[in-house]
Amino acid sequence: MDAGAPTWLVAGLGNPGARYARTRHNIGWLALDALASEPFREEKRFDGEVARCDGAWLIKPTTFMNLSGVAVRALADFYKVPHDRVLVVLDDAALPFGRLRIRPSGSAGSHNGLESILVHFATQEVPRLRIGIGAPPPPMALHDYVLAPFGPDEEGTLKAVLDRSAEAIRVILKNGLAAAMNEFNKEGL
């Protein structure tokens, strides 16, 4: 991490409960599980599961996706983490499975979890790591697709995707967004 810079808060988006544990919409949680150097612990005051890694705070909001901003903002306020040091890790159906895209800011697109965070911080200047989950096959609705478990082909490469996502987060924490964007915003695994 940058000496003297504020710490990072990394928020992995997902939904609580066994029903959602291995679904595409929970890839943010799965990426944080791959990253964490200690077990997550439930923190009711932050509406989430919290851990530490490389000096950063990690949170898996347990508010359900559409209210993720409540949990992320609570932890950021408590530890005085500015919005530009909050990294949101989320699924993206517009990216091919396994593709990573790191951005320092932008709109939420159609992602309600990211939208909740942007609303709670009142800015679009919140960094994010989007992890591609691919588009739903026709005629499947996007809502059904993101809440479905990974397919057999995806499960076969999921560990590599999660390991690469965790490595991208580590590069962000250590060297910053620009370095990570140069290294990971490329096609494929």
Predicted regions and their residues:
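Nucleotide and nucleotide-moiety/phosphate-recognizing core
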Residues: 1-105, 114-129, 136-141, 148, ...
